[in-house]
């Protein structure tokens, strides 16, 4: 599965928005995601991509745009 599309699918499910043309938009500052949605996103990413992202190690600034999320998932897949 394409990582970018998989991440966008999860974000679409959580936000109800197509973010494919907003890859560098801060999804927290624009109100699309909150802390509860972050936990749901992490759980979905872990399940879909078979990666481990402990909530305790989640730094929102590293996961605040779709592009950053894709990059983090790709780096975790390669560990």
UniProtKB/Swiss-Prot annotation:
This is D-alanyl carrier protein. GO terms for biological process: cell wall organization; lipoteichoic acid biosynthetic process. Carrier protein involved in the D-alanylation of lipoteichoic acid (LTA). The loading of thioester-linked D-alanine onto DltC is catalyzed by D-alanine--D-alanyl carrier protein ligase DltA. The DltC-carried D-alanyl group is further transferred to cell membrane phosphatidylglycerol (PG) by forming an ester bond, probably catalyzed by DltD. D-alanylation of LTA plays an important role in modulating the properties of the cell wall in Gram-positive bacteria, influencing the net charge of the cell wall. NCBIfam families: dltC, PRK05087.1. Belongs to the DltC family. 4'-phosphopantetheine is transferred from CoA to a specific serine of apo-DCP. Keywords: Cell wall biogenesis/degradation, Cytoplasm, Phosphopantetheine, Phosphoprotein. GO terms for cellular component: cytoplasm. One of its GO terms (molecular function) is D-alanyl carrier activity. SUPFAM superfamilies: ACP-like (SSF47336). Pathway: Cell wall biogenesis; lipoteichoic acid biosynthesis. Pfam families: PP-binding. Residues 1-77 form the Carrier domain. The gene is dltC. It is found in: Cytoplasm. The modification O-(pantetheine 4'-phosphoryl)serine is found at residue 35.
